[in-house]
Amino acid sequence: MSETPAQSSIKQERISYTPPESPVASHRSSTPLHVHTVPRALRMEEDSIHLPTHLRLQPIYWSRDDVAQWLKWAENEFSLRPIESNKFEMNGKALLLLTKEDFRYRSPHSGDVLYELLQHILKQRKSRMLFSPFFPPGDSIHTKPEVLLHQNHDEDNCVQRTPRTPAESVHHNPPTIELLHRPRSPITTNHRPSPDPEQQRPQRSPLDNMSRRLSPVEKAQGPRLQQENNHQETYPLSVSPVENNHCLPSSPWQESTRVIQLMPSPIMHPLILNPRHSHSVDFKQSRHSEDGMNREGKPINLSHREDLAYLNHIMVSMSPPEEHAMPIGRIADCRLLWDYVYQLLSDSRYENFIRWEDKESKIFRIVDPNGLARLWGNHKNRTNMTYEKMSRALRHYYKLNIIRKEPGQRLLFRFMKTPDEIMSGRTDRLEHLESQVLDEQTYQEDEPTIASPVGWPRGNLPTGTAGGVMEAGELGVAVKEETRE
């Protein structure tokens, strides 16, 4: 009879005994602890989730029917209350956008379990891809169970929550949409929780280097930090743009924000870096060394630490080429107008100004005369360039059989020779003629026509006829427009 009370006492002690959860247990919320949520979270962290075969794709690729089947499977697997599937009429991409509060709103009795289950499935899928020298298994994937002990059913707070591991960062990164969880506990140069020494492995990941830099004073501030975090239970959604094709670290005042970064796929795409690529990442505000320190030797704050975690799944800049900028018309080693026109015709950026009508026949059209004149003036550093002046320079080439205007067609021209033929045929004569006329007509740069000056005998003009004077004037203006640097 004496053994029965002893045995019952031992059993009672086994049931009532609970291991210490954290050094900050005294700062928990006054709300009673819901013990039934803890075993579920721990069980999902420790055990593998065996989904049906048709649900073993990444959740981002789930269809609406797959989401409904997943809800039905979870309801049976975990003995949950009936889940209204019409509250989750969405595909896998949309499902990943939901916060824990969204899950609770759609399913008040089972939303928290569904959310944790989804996170564990994502982590389990990604863990098969991340075991590499750059992703140590002990540091990158698994988290100690005691770190994940939930205090109550209504608040999404942890006793000592470590920053998001690379696995958690990666599974929120589909090809064109980027979800980034902010840690619940802000880690700045003034507030840092104490790291778990058991989590420091011989193999070091970028996150390990940060935790080793914490001072004893900073470790002692963990209880106060947890008390502050009890008031941060909402996680609003916000859209964060990408500036200059770099993933910008958020400010320390936005640690409770769940950020969704939308990025066009042709410019930026996610890439799991290996050691070869890890040294080529350029963050906008600071560049960090491998041990998690900035150039001044000070430990970096939360946003920079999250950047280091994001090295495991970084958005690599794929900057569009500079040619997509607005063309300014400057072309190197191009002095003459006919050559400049050829260069513009060969560049698709200038099709709004000038383009080929028939490339085989060398027929081209000036689409925007005034715009083309501005390009030519910019190339020659002439702000007062107009199409009237440029057209006189074009007419100069009529006489040399280089360019001809198409009869009866406005702004339609034809090259009579290829650039090689022009350069090899009459280049010397062209240079000599342009140089000679330039010397005689320098002072008449902006005159539309050339008239005989008072007191200047007609015989001293370049040619002896009035028509010759006009031709020489046109030639002089054309040459002046081209040769003035």
Swiss-Prot record:
SMART domains from the xrefs?
ETS (SM00413), SAM_PNT (SM00251)
Q: Which residues carry this modification: Phosphothreonine?
A: T18, T165
Where Phosphoserine occurs, the residues are: S22, S215, S240, S251, S319
Q: Which residues form the PNT domain?
A: 41-125
Locations listed in the record: Nucleus
* Chain positions with N6-acetyllysine modification: K11, K298
Decide whether keyword Phosphoprotein is in the record.
Answer: yes
Q: What superkingdom does the record give?
A: Eukaryota
Protein name per UniProt? Transcription factor ETV6
| Source organism of this protein record | Mus musculus
